Design a protein with these regions (language model features):
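Conserved Nudix-box catalytic region and its N-terminal flanking loop in Nudix hydrolases
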Residues: 16-58
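Charged phosphate-binding loop/patch that engages nucleotide di/tri-phosphates or the phosphate backbone
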Residues: 117-134
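Conserved N-terminal beta-strand and adjoining loop/helix that marks the start
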Residues: 1-20
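A generic structural signal for short hydrophobic patches within well-formed alpha-helices
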Residues: 41, 113-114, 125
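Short, well-ordered beta-strand micro-motif
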Residues: 9-11, 23, 84-88
Length: 134
């Protein structure tokens, strides 16, 4: 079974909570939804949090700090399982397209994120808000 791991890094922006999202590059993905920075484990990589950290650095150029697990979802079409980890973005975080895999990487206000994020990943936003309130 395929699996991916990624991060949902957040910060306080001028208009409230913002989250770091990326958009896949290429014509095929032009109209596709945004995503949390994520990817599949490398050969021999069995620590999903380490995978999430590596992918965030590789795709968005941001080094994740302290993280908590947000659980997983399973894509209905591909049956791929996505594991997410959340944490505050480092103060100096300056997202950039650090890989050919993405054409945009930026902090997005959470209300906008709900509209542009892959529909099956939106639950991670809800879980993040629950963790921050609890």
């Amino acid at each position: 079974m395929k699996q991916s791991a990624g991060t949902l890094l957040y910060r306080d922006g001028p208009d409230g909570l913002e989250v770091l999202l990326v958009h896949a590059s290429g014509n095929y993905n032009r109209k596709k939804p945004w995503s949390i920075p994520k990817g599949e484990p490398d050969e021999g990589e069995d620590d999903l949090e380490a995978t999430a950290r590596r992918e965030t650095l590789e795709e968005a150029g941001v080094q994740a700090g302290e993280l908590i697990a947000l659980g997983s979802i399973r894509y209905s079409k591909s049956k791929k399982t996505i594991y997410a980890f959340a944490g505050p973005a480092p103060a100096e975080a300056a997202p950039r397209c650090a890989s050919w895999e993405v054409d945009q990487a930026r902090f997005v206000p959470i209300d906008e994120a709900r509209k542009i994020l892959h529909p099956e990943q939106v639950v991670f936003l809800d879980r993040l808000l629950q963790c921050r309130m609890g």
